């Protein structure tokens, strides 16, 4: 399989991820915080060490790491909690995933929300002066920004946006599903209140383990409830972190894989991995641009992109193109990629695009297979 679907989930994983998960399940496999026996204690230590690794990776030793099964659940916990605390003027980027927009839409059926899109100009630059004016006109309570679009890879200047937002004491949330472990971001800065991450994407870990980073002095009302292994006589969720938001048994085998992947990333270097991915993105763009029947969507010069490219093929729907690529043993993602707002901005709604996404593991052999498929399409248009 020539794999160009890394924005959905990265593949392959570093070999150490497979080995660590196998070893964990065969030799430990305990439940964290659920006993004093050696298996449980060893697993609890692993969970604690993985939190420290995430703090190291994201430069936030003073902030709390909370594990969840998915980034979508993490975003729900944060967004629903912040709104319950009173946020009403909510700014989002034009490129948010349904994990954000559907959550806000669901809340808006029960609460009066003023949802405003941050200004991005036609050349795909966040207009900071216009955003400053937006905030002056309607002061923000809550600002949510996808660090990189999962449709075309544009990286947002989140620090600059959040500096503006903090003048109004807004709560800030960055969705790092497409960037954690790939784009260096100092979450230790005061402007970052919350950040969601997806372990199975740019963090190169397994599916089923994600979470968020938060300032420890912010209290969100929990939206999910259950056992935590602590304060079991108390029928309210504990006030202590991270237990307040970690209900049920943690995916400890997933955490073991994430621990291994983060160690691998730290050893190789975040900047090195980004540079390698950017080189692969340039190779992908060069290949696609050889064919005049392909239209690249949402691209411009600059290095503020992760390894995602969206395109259209003249005369072929994105769905049909996906079937052609699949029949040629190529993995891509077609349609709206769970981000209809981005496609409305790019004027590719409702059909969507063909999305290719590369990373450091994308090989020359993958590009050779893709070229053969593009030649097939060229010969049969």
Region annotations inferred by a language model:
Residues 1-381:
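Pyridoxal 5′-phosphate
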């Amino acid at each position: 399989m020539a794999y160009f679907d890394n924005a959905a989930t990265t593949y392959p994983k570093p070999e150490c991820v497979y080995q660590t998960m196998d070893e964990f399940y065969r030799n430990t496999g305990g439940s964290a915080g659920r006993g004093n026996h050696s298996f449980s204690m060893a697993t609890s230590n692993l969970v604690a060490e993985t939190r420290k690794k995430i703090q190291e990776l994201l430069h936030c030793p003073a902030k709390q790491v909370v594990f969840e099964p998915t980034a979508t659940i993490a975003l729900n916990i944060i967004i629903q909690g912040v709104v319950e605390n009173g946020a009403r003027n909510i700014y989002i980027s034009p490129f948010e995933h349904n994990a954000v927009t559907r959550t806000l839409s669901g809340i808006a059926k029960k609460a009066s929300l003023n949802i405003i899109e941050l200004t991005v100009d036609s050349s795909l630059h966040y207009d900071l002066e216009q955003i400053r004016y937006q905030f002056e006109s309607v002061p923000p309570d809550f600002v949510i920004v996808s660090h990189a679009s999962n449709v075309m890879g544009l990286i947002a200047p989140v620090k600059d946006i959040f500096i503006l937002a903090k003048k109004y004491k807004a709560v800030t949330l960055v969705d790092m599903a497409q960037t954690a472990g790939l784009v260096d971001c100092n979450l230790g800065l005061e402007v970052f209140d919350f950040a969601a991450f997806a372990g199975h994407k740019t963090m190169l870990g397994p599916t089923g383990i994600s979470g968020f980073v938060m300032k420890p002095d912010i209290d969100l009302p929990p939206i999910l409830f259950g056992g935590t292994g602590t304060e079991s006589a108390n029928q309210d969720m504990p006030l202590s972190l991270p237990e307040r938001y970690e209900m049920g048994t943690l995916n400890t085998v997933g955490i073991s894989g994430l621990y291994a992947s983060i160690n691998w990333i730290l050893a190789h270097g975040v900047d090195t991995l980004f540079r390698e991915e950017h080189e692969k993105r340039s190779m992908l763009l060069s290949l696609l641009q050889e064919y005049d029947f392909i239209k690249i969507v949402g691209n411009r010069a600059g290095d503020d992109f992760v390894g995602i490219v969206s395109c259209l093929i003249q005369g072929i729907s994105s769905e049909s193109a996906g079937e052609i690529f699949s029949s040629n043993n190529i993995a891509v993602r077609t349609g709206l990629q769970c981000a209809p707002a981005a496609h409305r901005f790019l004027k590719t709604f409702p059909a969507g695009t063909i999305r290719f996404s590369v990373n450091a593991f994308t090989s020359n052999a993958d590009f050779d297979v893709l070229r053969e498929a593009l030649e097939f399409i060229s010969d049969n248009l």
